[in-house]
Amino acid sequence: NNVYGMQVLLEAMVRHHVDKIVFSSTAAVYGEPKRVPILEDDETNPTNTYGETKRTMEKMMKWVSRADGVRYVSLRYFNAAGALDDGSIGEDHHPETHLIPLILQVPLGKRDYITVFGDDYPTPDGTCLRDYIHVIDLADAHVLALEYLRKGGESNIFNLGNGKGFSVKEMIEAAKKATGKDIKVEMGARRAGDPAQLIASSEKARKVLGWQPRYTDVEQVIGTAWTWHQKHPDWYQD
């Protein structure tokens, strides 16, 4: 349980005089945004349970910071994606829920088609828009956030994204180019709680942390994931 786990962690930190924490949060805390790109001080109004738990965890850190002096950085990930360039480390979820691995399961022969959940959203092609950020860029941000706290930085929140949205259909087309293979698509109904678009403004992280994403081309991001999947066709079970 996210919330209970955070309670136990924060209590242990206070008890053992650990006064800094870098937290992996999520863009899901925003829910359906009133504007894009999203800024860190925009309203948070989650539309799913996951986002609500992360927002609650952020609030818990805020109160512990005030009461006990624990300083925190909350990194609000947008859509984490990709793998190490050499294909040694990648995504392995059971069941898989992330879009890029699900798309790549089709050219891998693990599924017959990818389902697109809804094509009637208020976006250019009717499918959801998301901002994809490579895992290496996320790792870089974590190191910078820790350095920021070690240098005395105050508690803070940062968005982590590339600042550009790609639709589900665009991601499928990019995957076709990255893999050189056709990908069959079937349409499905909308999923409850899916915002039409989530696109970050990460200017604050760039200015305050000095963060500079290295993977800004979505086809390149998908390409790193494809390399991992080709080397691990049965995931880490092989």
Language-model features, listed with the residues they occupy:
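Generic secondary-structure boundary/loop-capping signal
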Residues: 27, 33-35, 40-41, 47, ...
